[in-house]
């Protein structure tokens, strides 16, 4: 197993030095879901929620969150994102909203944290907009499913997609 990179020889937290890394095209894909009561899902699908377009607002929230990741995660590098796509879909069994985010950059460090942050905030936005009608919503399954670029090459979670 590799060692933790965010600690120095004294065991103190530090931001990893990426200055000597090559600038490469990097991609990360993350996903997660929020389960809910069937009536809540019907409200989202119908577009009649009194707060507005739940999925549209969650999509924008995810994009905005990806751009703020380094402000939220203390040792995360601020990076220049070149593309962020937030895909939201619904399912009947179990009643849920699935979120899949693709984030891209050309840089010296990966873009996984931005993709993961976008998923979390998009799902939190669904929760926030629907909590008045459903306190039983549960978020889960947030994970990285693809990473490419950089010296570690391409990694894919088996069975994802």
From Swiss-Prot:
Pfam families noted in UniProt: MoaC (PF01967)
Reaction(s) this enzyme catalyzes, per UniProt: (8S)-3',8-cyclo-7,8-dihydroguanosine 5'-triphosphate = cyclic pyranopterin phosphate + diphosphate
EC number: 4.6.1.17
Binding annotation for substrate: 75-77, 113-114
EC class: lyase
GO molecular function terms listed in the Swiss-Prot or TrEMBL record: cyclic pyranopterin monophosphate synthase activity
Pathway assigned in UniProt: Cofactor biosynthesis; molybdopterin biosynthesis
UniProt keyword terms in alphabetical order: Lyase, Molybdenum cofactor biosynthesis
Enzyme active site: 128
Top-level lineage group: Bacteria
GO-annotated biological processes: Mo-molybdopterin cofactor biosynthetic process
UniProt function note: Catalyzes the conversion of (8S)-3',8-cyclo-7,8-dihydroguanosine 5'-triphosphate to cyclic pyranopterin monophosphate (cPMP).
Protein family according to the UniProt entry: Belongs to the MoaC family.
Subunit organization: Homohexamer; trimer of dimers.
Protein name: Cyclic pyranopterin monophosphate synthase
Species annotation: Thioalkalivibrio sulfidiphilus (strain HL-EbGR7)
Lineage of origin: Bacteria, Pseudomonadati, Pseudomonadota, Gammaproteobacteria, Chromatiales
This protein's encoding gene: moaC
